[in-house]
Design a protein with these regions (language model features):
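Eukaryote-biased recognition of long, low-complexity, charge-rich segments
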Residues: 2-10, 15, 169-290, 294-318
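Alpha-solenoid helical repeat scaffolds
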Residues: 2-161, 165-166, 290-293, 298, ...
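Short secondary-structure transition/capping segments
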Residues: 115, 395-398
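Short, highly charged low-complexity linear segments
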Residues: 132, 170-180, 214-217, 398, ...
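Residue-level detector of well-ordered alpha-helical segments, enriched
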Residues: 68, 283-286, 394
Length: 453
C-alpha cells in the first residue's frame, strides 16, 4: 500500500506540473481521490495494528503456549520490517530483547530471526543503539546456546551487529566468538568463520599490497596480508590438530583456497617493508597444516573428520568441481613440493603432512605438463626424508607417498618403482650395517635395538 501511495503521489505531481491547457481535470480529480483513499486505508491499517498490539500482542507475547509466543514475536518482526518508521522504537523492539530469554528454544529461534532481520535494515544503528547496549550480553550467551539452530542464528545475528556497529562488541567477546570456528558443530563453526572473516577483512589496508615484493623481487599476491592474519590467528589459538575445522569454518573466505599465496608466504623471503608478512617457524608449521587441510577438503568435497557425520553423496556438479580443484592444486603444488620438503626436512610431522599432498594431486601432470625435473627433485627429497631419524608418522607418510607414486597404470610408475627399489636397497643395507654394529654388544642391547627396528 505504501508503494502504491508513493506511485500515486508521483503521478499526481506530474499531472500538476503540466500546463493548464495540457492538464486533464478529470484525471487530476481521480488521482487526488485515489491518493486520499489510500491515505485513509493506511490510517485504518495502522489503527488495526495498534489495536492488535495493545489488545492482543501485549497480552499474549508471554502466553503459556510457546506456539503463541512464537507467533507474537514473529509478527512483531514482520511489523518492524513493514513499517520501521513506526515500530523501530524502544517501546516495541524491547519485546524482541525480552523474548531472547525465553525458555523454549523454538521461541528463542524465532526471536533471533526477527532481531537478525532488524539489524539488516538501513540506518539501524540510529534506532537500535540502546537495544544493542541493553541486550548484547545475552546475544553473546545465545552464541553458546545448547540448541544448535539458535546458536548458529545468534552468531549470524552478531555478524550483522558487528557490521552495523563495529566497536560495540569487545575484543574479549570477539575472541570467544572466534574460538567457535573450532566447534564440532559445523554450522556454528561456519557462522563463526563468517564473523572472523568479516573482522579480518576490516583490518586489511584499503589499497592492498599491490606494490609489495618479496626479497628476490617477486610481486606478492593481493591476499597475502589476509592469509598471514589467518595463519597468525590459527597459531595463537593453540588448538593444534584442528586446523581442518578452521579451514571448513572459513569456507566463505576465498583465500583459504589461494594455494599460490600459501606457497608464496612459505617459500619467499620478505622484502623491504614486508616485515608483517614474515612467518615464525611455529606459524609456518600451522600454515602447512592449513594448506594440506584446504587441499584435502577442496578436492574431496567432504567435511573434516569429526564434523559432519556421514559422507555427502556427490552430485555431478561436485564431481566437476573436484576435478577442477585437483587440477588447480596440482599446477600450484607439484613444482613447489620439493622446495617445501627441503625447507621442513628437520620437522618430521610437517614433512609427513606435505607427503600426504600427493594423495590429492594429479600425478599424470608430471608427464603431461612436462614436469620431469620436479619429479626428479621430489624423488631426491623422498630419498633424503628416508635418511632422517625414525619417526612413526613420517615413515607411514613415506609408505603412502611411495605407494601413490607407484600406482599401476601411472605414466611415472616405472620411473618411481626404480627409485623406490634403490631406496629400499639402501634401507636394507642400513639395517644390515646396524645389525652388524650391535651384534657384538650385550644381549640386552641387541634385544632393545631389534624391538626398535
Amino acid at each position: 500500500m505504501k508503494d502504491q501511495r508513493a506511485r500515486s503521489r508521483r503521478q499526481l505531481q506530474l499531472e500538476q506540473r503540466k500546463s493548464a491547457e495540457a492538464r486533464a481535470a478529470d484525471r487530476l480529480e481521480m488521482l487526488e481521490a485515489k491518493l486520499s483513499e489510500m491515505e485513509e486505508n493506511l490510517t485504518e491499517v495502522a489503527t488495526i495494528i495498534e489495536y492488535l498490539v495493545k489488545s492482543v500482542f501485549i497480552l499474549r507475547w508471554k502466553d503459556v503456549a510457546s506456539e503463541i509466543r512464537s507467533l507474537c514475536i514473529e509478527q512483531l518482526g514482520n511489523w518492524v520490517q513493514i513499517n520501521p518508521a513506526r515500530f523501530l522504537e524502544a517501546s516495541y523492539i524491547k519485546y524482541l530483547g525480552w523474548a531472547l530469554y525465553d525458555q523454549e528454544h523454538e521461541v528463542r529461534l524465532v526471536c533471533v530471526h526477527a532481531a537478525a532481520k532488524m539489524y539488516k535494515l538501513p540506518n539501524i544503528e540510529e534506532h537500535a543503539e540502546d537495544f544493542t547496549t541493553r541486550f548484547l550480553p545475552h546475544m553473546l550467551k545465545l552464541a553458546l546456546d545448547k540448541d544448535i539452530d539458535v546458536a548458529t542464528e545468534a552468531v549470524l545475528m552478531l555478524v550483522d551487529v558487528a557490521k552495523q556497529q563495529p566497536d560495540v562488541i569487545s575484543d574479549e567477546d570477539k575472541e570467544q566468538l572466534f574460538l567457535l570456528c573450532f566447534s564440532q558443530h559445523r554450522r556454528v563453526g561456519q557462522a563463526a568463520g563468517l564473523f572472523l572473516h568479516q573482522w579480518l577483512k576490516s583490518r586489511q589496508p584499503a589499497s592492498g599490497p599491490q606494490s609489495a615484493r618479496s626479497k628476490r623481487g617477486k610481486p606478492r599476491p593481493l591476499d597475502s596480508s589476509l592469509l598471514k592474519d589467518i595463519i597468525t590467528f590459527a597459531e595463537e589459538s593453540s588448538l593444534r590438530g584442528r586446523e581442518a575445522f578452521l579451514v571448513d569454518s572459513l569456507a566463505c573466505c576465498d583465500s583459504m583456497q589461494a594455494w599460490e599465496t600459501f606457497v608464496d608466504l612459505l617459500i619467499e623471503q620478505p622484502g623491504p617493508g614486508e616485515e608483517s608478512l614474515a612467518l615464525e617457524e611455529e606459524e609456518e608449521v600451522v600454515a602447512v597444516a592449513l594448506l594440506v587441510a584446504s587441499v584435502r577438503q577442496t578436492v574431496e568435497k567432504q567435511p573434516p573428520q569429526g564434523r559432519g557425520g556421514q559422507k555427502r553423496v556427490l552430485t555431478v556438479k561436485d564431481q566437476e568441481e573436484r576435478k577442477q580443484a585437483r587440477e588447480a592444486a596440482t599446477v600450484c603444488l607439484l613444482p613447489a613440493l620439493p622446495h617445501l620438503l627441503q625447507k621442513f626436512l628437520h620437522l618430521p610431522e610437517t614433512v609427513a603432512l606435505l607427503l600426504d599432498l600427493l594423495q590429492w594431486l594429479n600425478l599424470e601432470m608430471y608427464t603431461v605438463g612436462r614436469q620431469g625435473k620436479a619429479l626428479d627433485e621430489l624423488l631426491l627429497m623422498v630419498n633424503e626424508v628416508m635418511k632422517q631419524p625414525e619417526h612413526p608418522a613420517l615413515f607411514d607418510a613415506l609408505s603412502r607417498a611411495l605407494e601413490r607414486l607407484c600406482v599401476p597404470g601411472l605414466s611415472i610408475q616405472a620411473r618411481c618403482e626404480t627409485a623406490r627399489g634403490h631406496m629400499l636397497d639402501r634401507l636394507a643395507t642400513r639395517y644390515r650395517e646396524g645389525l652388524d654394529d650391535v651384534s657384538s654388544r650385550p644381549s640386552n642391547t641387541m634385544e632393545h635395538w631389534t624391538r626398535r627396528v
